[in-house]
Amino acid sequence: MTPRLVGGIVGALKREMGGASAMLTSFEAKEDGSVSIAGIYPGKVMPVTLVAGQEFVAEQSAFLAAEDTVQYTFQTVGLGAAFFGGEGFILQKFVGPGTVFIHIVGDVVEHDIDGAPVDIDPGHIAGFDATLQYKIKFVDNVRTAMFGGVGLFLATFTGKGKVYAHSVSKFKLAAEIYLEGQQTAHKK
């Protein structure tokens, strides 16, 4: 087990500014053994295997681990996505070859995009193939957004590739746990 700076001083500063740790821990087997990884919310750990040059984009907090052959950087998105989309201002971009392990809150919902535009709640997006283009748009019907539990913004994906989504957003999960705790506290 060895702590190391990823991408040198500049890479470490970018990671720190993106809300991630400047240091990563590297594990190398000297004999048979295993390393366990887990997210902080109930959910799934999903391996994403990338061939040489293949790119994958994930939300900032989804990254758990990667093989040392995988390169990763941060990618910024528009201010609309940052403040209203739930995705955050900074995304992580991974370039193969190698396997990246990401954490998905709840179950994994996989969307195959093949040309036709697909709208997804930005708070549910865990990661997607970099072959896809996406933009954040305002929901057409404000009444549906307010009373339908959808949110004010949607991410529209076009192109060809896959989007991996959370079955429940982190914000919704946290709110449900908080509300359940409040109801339990008031019953005592």
Region spans (language model):
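Phosphate/adenylate-binding glycine loop and adjacent helical scaffold
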Residues: M1-K188
